[in-house]
């Protein structure tokens, strides 16, 4: 039976057409790098203290001592959520009493910030935190906003594949790109926290949907050898490039509305790609639109300077060229992921693996404001370190076993994060460097986990297995802002938690089967056994009948993109 790759082999693998598709689709991901982690600057919390109204009659001495002091990470700093009772200190000021000399400040009654807060503007002129006072009793709202963005990503993950299967890769790519850009633009005019959060959720839905559509379109149009590079390096590196440019925008534009507008506008420019990116011929064939697919392929041949055959698709073979996804396989359900002890343990381990990697990746990215040093430089470095991480992951996938590659990357990331707490407070650059190395290790693991998981599950439930694992990843990203939030109580706590979880997961990874150089399993019974189950199941088989393989159908071996 013919297949699409054989029929279109005359186009070559890396002609002008393929290069255009590779770079244009990768470039369409750059705006995702802007919005994916824009919360680092949009929801940043500047230094703040209770506002003392100018109308209150206080001497300069009492105005300077109106805020109680507290010890935090060594030195004494003004409290952020309390002040001395204004009526009391105003009375002392009127009587001519001096703070500290005539009045014991530790005995004074305190009150909340009844008149709002004053925010330091050395780094940020405004953020949503300063505009809507999302501090103190409302400090949970800023991480909630970020979590809702990732809730949108979770929802978009569920619908994007179904929409592109029904309406076409190109249509959904540009529709969700418009959704991503449009709601981000409306977000600029948010009048309150609730409106901003709702729109941020919708932005998250468009964000992941156009990412997935671009990924699928590229993998369907590029040859086998090129699509591997596109999936592991192309879209990931261009996302990282957008992430690297984000702090440059933020450095020059320090007011959150103008910054959001600036990082939204490049998405408008991507609309021009409509006239350069064609629909997926594979999808057109699956819909029976053979003539349209031929037109695209002949145009590709012309761009590559190749003369196309007089007949590309033989009508008698048209049905055989349908994607496997268009065939109706025997029904399998989510229950199949826990049907046998082996696949049940593998599924649980995969959920833990994906959840932990996602918490580490997004937690470290969102924790940028809490790092010592310049926030803009730190953000750039955390983005730049992803590029060599992706390259390393690609090399490891080519030459080293999957299990040890994953475990090694996670051990590296987790161990250096645990070392952060041991660094003396005056060695800021060392602690920041360790965080960068931790991000490097976790990013490498994130880049490999899609491939590894897809290879472990059998064809009949592969999409479900990767889908459930990917859902765990989304849940990890939703939780990650609250790992960062814990840093308000102790700056070392996020690193201790993320480092411990990452090392624990690295140990769990060592019990996964090895998939490198092994044929992909087609049925549940063909799956490799999880470590420690091999011996137990081999013994049990001596006294029990083998599991029935049943009638299963073979579906396409697919993998999904790393989701941001």
UniProtKB/Swiss-Prot annotation:
The chain crosses the membrane at residues 21-41, 143-163, 173-193, 198-218, 233-253, 258-278, 345-365, 377-397, 410-430, 434-454, 466-486, 492-512. It is a multi-pass membrane protein. Its main location: membrane. PROSITE patterns: MFS, SUGAR_TRANSPORT_1. Glycans are attached at residues 57, 64, 91. Residues 532-564 are annotated as: Disordered. ATP binds at residues 218-225. GO terms for biological process: carnitine transport; monoatomic ion transport. It holds the Pfam family Sugar_tr. Residues 42-142, 194-197, 254-257, 366-376, 431-433, 487-491 are extracellular. Predominantly expressed in testis. One of its GO terms (cellular component) is peroxisomal membrane. Sodium-ion independent, medium affinity carnitine transporter. Also transports organic cations such as tetraethylammonium (TEA) without the involvement of sodium. Relative uptake activity ratio of carnitine to TEA is 746. This is Solute carrier family 22 member 21. It comes from Mus musculus.
């Amino acid at each position: 039976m013919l297949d699409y790759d054989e029929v279109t082999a005359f186009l070559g693998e890396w002609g002008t057409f393929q290069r255009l598709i590779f770079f244009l689709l990768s470039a369409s991901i750059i705006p995702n790098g802007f919005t994916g982690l824009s919360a680092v600057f949009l929801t940043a919390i500047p230094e703040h203290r209770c506002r003392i109204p100018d109308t209150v009659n206080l001497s300069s001495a009492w105005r300077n001592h109106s805020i109680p002091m507290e010890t935090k990470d060594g030195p004494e700093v003004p409290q952020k959520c309390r002040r001395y009772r204004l009526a009391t200190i105003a009375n002392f000021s009127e009587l001519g009493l001096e703070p500290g000399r005539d009045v014991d400040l530790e005995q004074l009654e305190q009150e909340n910030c009844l008149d709002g807060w004053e925010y330091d503007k050395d780094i940020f002129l405004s953020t949503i935190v300063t505009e809507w006072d999302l501090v103190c009793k409302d400090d949970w709202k800023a991480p909630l906003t970020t979590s809702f963005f990732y809730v949108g990503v979770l929802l978009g993950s569920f619908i994007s594949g179904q929409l592109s299967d029904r309406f076409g890769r190109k249509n959904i790519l540009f529709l969700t790109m418009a959704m991503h850009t449009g709601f981000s633009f409306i977000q600029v005019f948010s009048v309150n926290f609730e409106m901003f959060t709702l729109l941020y959720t919708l932005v998250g839905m468009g964000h992941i949907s156009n990412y997935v559509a671009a990924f699928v379109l590229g993998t369907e149009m590029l040859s086998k050898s090129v699509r591997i590079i596109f999936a592991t390096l192309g879209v990931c590196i261009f996302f990282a490039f957008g992430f690297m440019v984000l702090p440059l925008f933020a450095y020059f534009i320090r007011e959150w509305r103008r910054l959001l507008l600036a990082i939204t506008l490049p998405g408008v420019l991507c609309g021009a790609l409509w006239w350069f990116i064609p629909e997926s011929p594979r999808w057109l064939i699956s819909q029976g639109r053979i003539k349209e697919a031929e037109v695209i392929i002949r145009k590709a041949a012309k761009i590559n300077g190749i003369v196309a055959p007089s007949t590309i698709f033989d009508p008698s073979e048209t049905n055989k060229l349908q994607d496997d996804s268009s065939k109706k396989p025997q029904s399998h359900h989510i229950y199949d992921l826990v049907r046998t002890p082996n696949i049940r343990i593998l599924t649980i381990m995969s959920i833990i693996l994906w959840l932990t990697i996602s918490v580490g990746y997004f937690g470290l990215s969102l924790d940028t404001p809490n790092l010592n040093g310049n926030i803009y430089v730190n953000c750039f470095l955390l983005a730049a370190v992803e590029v060599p991480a992706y390259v390393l992951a690609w090399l490891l996938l080519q030459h080293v076993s999957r299990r040890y590659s994953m475990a090694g990357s996670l051990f590296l990331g987790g161990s250096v994060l645990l070392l952060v707490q041991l660094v003396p407070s005056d060695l800021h650059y060392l602690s920041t460097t360790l965080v960068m190395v931790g991000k490097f290790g976790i990013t490498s693991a994130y880049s490999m986990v899609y491939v590894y998981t897809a290879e472990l599950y059998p064809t009949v439930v592969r999409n479900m297995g990767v889908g459930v694992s990917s859902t765990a990843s989304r849940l990890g990203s939703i939780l990650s802002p609250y790992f960062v939030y814990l840093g308000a109580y102790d700056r070392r706590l996020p690193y201790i938690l993320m480092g411990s979880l990452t090392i624990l997961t690295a140990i769990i990874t060592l019990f996964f089967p090895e998939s490198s150089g092994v044929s992909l399993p087609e049925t549940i019974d063909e799956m490799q056994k999880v470590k420690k189950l091999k011996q137990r199941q081999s013994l049990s088989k001596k006294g029990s009948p083998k599991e029935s393989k049943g009638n299963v159908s073979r579906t396409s071996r697919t993998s999904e993109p790393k989701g941001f």
